Amino acid sequence: MSDVQVHQLYIHGRYVEATSGKTFNSINPANGEIIATLQQASEQDIEAAVKSAQQGQKIWAAMTAMERSRILRRAVDILRERNDELARLETLDTGKAYSETSTVDIVTGADVLEYYAGLATAIQGEQVPLRESSFFYTRREPLGVVAGIGAWNYPIQIALWKSAPALAAGNAMIFKPSETTPLTALKLAEIYTEAGLPDGVFNVVQGAGREIGQWLTEHPVIEKISFTGGVETGKKVMASAAGSTLKEVTMELGGKSPLIICEDADLNRAADIAVMANFFSSGQVCTNGTRVFVPKSLLVDFEKAVVERVKRIRIGDPMAEDTNFGPLTSFPHMEKVLSFIESGKQQGAKVLIGGGRATEGELAKGAYVLPTVFSDCTDQMAIVQEEIFGPVMSILSYETEEEVIQRANDTTFGLAAGVVTQDISRAHRIIHQIEAGICWINTWGESPAEMPVGGYKQSGVGRENGLTTLGHYTRIKSIQVELGDYQSIF
């Protein structure tokens, strides 16, 4: 324990001692070892972060959009220079394969920051003539101080997805990372400061989600909450935000997304997409296509093709370059996923491959769950209805297009969906009837910076990324101007 570094809070451009006197540990899920100890924020610390953010935001908003853009672009350059270093830290903290964190997590997060840095100068109002002597114009003004609450599966990417549009629009952000994977958010704060961000514009306060989340959502100064996490927690955050000061919210919540394989689909492509849609990042992706609908005529061949591909997955030490499937992010989460797998077995689903914990050699020390594929699934099974957030694919057979659309939509979730077919008319026809906010045709999973992402139904409120999100971090002020005489009726 003496070699374990203790991390403080990051407030006003520097590390500061938390006042709670409490700490918690970050655990490497590949072997169960403690990799860091973190101080936990108190309500007093949240107040300090808010005051700091208020001060920094005034300075930040007073800068020209071009000045803000240049600072954010510097942060992008630093992120890319330190890609490998940040990726190694992300792998230690999350258990995700380094082959993934080094090519996806930091890269795509930096892409989003670069995108919004470029848009900072594009925030503008409009001018509308009313008559010869009068017109009105609008201003898009920053909200002020906003808060981001991150999830544990994509720590630095989520921190960037939330902070990039907020900062580009002239706001300050207080960010609370997941207590399971808090380390790279602190590194991001350092990078923002190094790039020239005024002190207080990006503060990081880590600790227990229930306490800190409540303090942030109820704080009267904070104007918006952007939350990524589970549905039930999201409902509480939204209720708290509305019940305190009618805060604006963005909610990126859970999913149980359908992947529809059509009868004319290329079998190899369909199997490749299904495996990526379920086992990338060890299955810990909110948009995973965990309900795979397959025509009965293709079922046997499709299952065989999927199993062949799952056998090629390389499970191992996440720091090893050839590993493409690491442990789950925490041991408690591993137990939750294993309980779902047992539920699937008990409810009559057939295990085609996997079906338990990986215990061979060094894997026994980590939170490893074997990539698992269930067949003979029904819509009523828990593994089909509930978000597992792990490497568990459920294959369901269907007969008609009308049937599969109805069943795909028969869920309280609506985050993502996909269709695999060689008939482009069919692809659009099906997708247009699917109740989901992010859809893919003949591919899966890519979320470029330019594309708005978010869910229907209980999968979320609002969007992240894309041009539309920038507007969500501003408010519109309307100003009418009268150049002529003013006539009173009194």
UniProtKB/Swiss-Prot annotation:
Active site: 162 (charge relay system), 252 (proton acceptor), 286 (nucleophile), 464 (charge relay system)
Site feature location: Seems to be a necessary countercharge to the potassium cations: 248
Matching InterPro entries: Ald_DH/histidinol_DH (IPR016161), Ald_DH_C (IPR016163), Ald_DH_CS_CYS (IPR016160), Ald_DH_CS_GLU (IPR029510), Ald_DH_N (IPR016162), Aldehyde_DH_dom (IPR015590), BADH (IPR011264)
Cofactor binding remark: Binds 2 potassium ions per subunit.
Cofactor entry: K(+)
Residues binding NAD(+), per UniProt: 150-152, 176-179, 230-233, 254, 286, 387
A single GO molecular function term of this UniProt record: betaine-aldehyde dehydrogenase (NAD+) activity
Keyword field: Metal-binding, NAD, NADP, Oxidation, Oxidoreductase, Potassium
Taxonomic superkingdom: Bacteria
EC number: 1.2.1.8
Pfam families the record matches: Aldedh
Residue numbers bearing the Cysteine sulfenic acid (-SOH) modification: 286
Stored CDD domains: ALDH_F9_TMBADH
Residues annotated as binding K(+) 2: 246, 457, 460
NCBIfam families the record matches: BADH, PRK13252.1
Family to which this protein belongs: Belongs to the aldehyde dehydrogenase family.
Assembly with partners or alone: Dimer of dimers.
HAMAP family: BADH (MF_00804)
Protein name: Betaine aldehyde dehydrogenase
Species annotation: Acinetobacter baumannii (strain ATCC 17978 / DSM 105126 / CIP 53.77 / LMG 1025 / NCDC KC755 / 5377)
